[in-house]
């Protein structure tokens, strides 16, 4: 998804959780989101109240955990709009709980995304304040169940055709993307498949957030292992990188790809993004 599509979906969650008629003249949707294709050690996201800006990192994590982090930062923005400050008090977690319950009800994420998220203190603090997450009262909400995204990858040669059909380029996905109804999606796929290999066409439900991108795994000091690297999809000086064997990988494959390299002694590994 593009940053703008992610932003619009977050705004839909806010509209459901904090309807304008109950919160007139609010500025809850007046923020910017920047998805950083970068791994950080000490935090997954951050909010700058003076700029109304949210940054999200660590795209190697499970998608549902990234969504939970994104809603955490949206919670800080709403908290700041209400109180002119934000912290990790019970007041903040009341806002976060409300956002999470709304997003789960809409199908944007699942309750398992919260239960399995063990790389932050949110789950512990939410249950301390509000009891077992599995016992929360969550109502299903009607949200885009009948809409899909079509994503077209490796499609530079047909980009003009895609633009003419209303597709927008997502630099995060590195794909051309269009939203449409379920009745249109399969027919559209057949049209695009006339121009490009069908394996480069993906259809995904539009009622969730999918935050994904690509990393470039760069391996150097590895002369003794070049045969192994070549067999496993690495290219010498690939993708414009210099003096390294390079493999383009989905961001959420980073940990598993790094694990495969552990058996190669003395190599140097760098993770790059474009």
Segments from the language model and where they lie:
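Active-site recognition of the HExxH zinc-binding catalytic motif
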Residues: 68-80
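Short pre-active-site segment immediately N-terminal to the catalytic Zn-binding motif
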Residues: 51-70, 84
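Auxiliary, metal-adjacent structural segments of Zn-dependent hydrolase domains
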Residues: 1-55, 99-102
């Amino acid at each position: 998804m593009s940053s703008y599509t992610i932003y619009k979906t977050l705004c839909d969650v806010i509209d459901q959780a904090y309807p304008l008629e109950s919160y007139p003249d609010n500025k809850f949707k007046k923020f910017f989101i920047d998805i950083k294709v970068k791994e950080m050690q000490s935090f997954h996201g951050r909010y700058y109240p003076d700029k109304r800006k949210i940054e999200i990192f660590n795209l190697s994590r499970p998608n549902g955990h990234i969504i939970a982090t994104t809603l955490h930062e949206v919670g800080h923005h709403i908290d700041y709009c209400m109180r002119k400050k934000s912290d990790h008090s019970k007041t903040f977690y009341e806002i976060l709980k409300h956002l999470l319950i709304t997003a789960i009800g809409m199908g944007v994420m699942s309750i398992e995304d919260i239960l399995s998220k063990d790389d932050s203190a949110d789950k512990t603090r939410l249950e301390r304040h509000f009891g077992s997450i599995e016992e929360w009262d969550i109502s299903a909400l009607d949200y885009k169940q009948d809409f899909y995204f079509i994503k077209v990858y490796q499609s530079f040669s047909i980009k003009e055709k895609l633009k003419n059909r209303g597709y927008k380029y997502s630099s995060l996905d590195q794909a051309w993307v269009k939203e449409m109804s379920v009745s249109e999606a399969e027919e559209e796929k057949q049209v695009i498949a006339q121009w490009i290999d069908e394996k480069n066409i993906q259809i995904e439900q539009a009622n969730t957030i999918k935050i994904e991108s690509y990393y470039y795994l760069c391996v150097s000091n590895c002369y003794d292992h070049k045969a192994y690297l070549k067999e496993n999809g690495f290219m010498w000086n690939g993708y414009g990188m210099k003096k390294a064997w390079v493999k383009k990988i989905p961001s959420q494959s980073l940990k598993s790809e790094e694990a495969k390299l552990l058996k190669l002694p003395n190599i140097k590994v760098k993770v790059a993004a474009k």
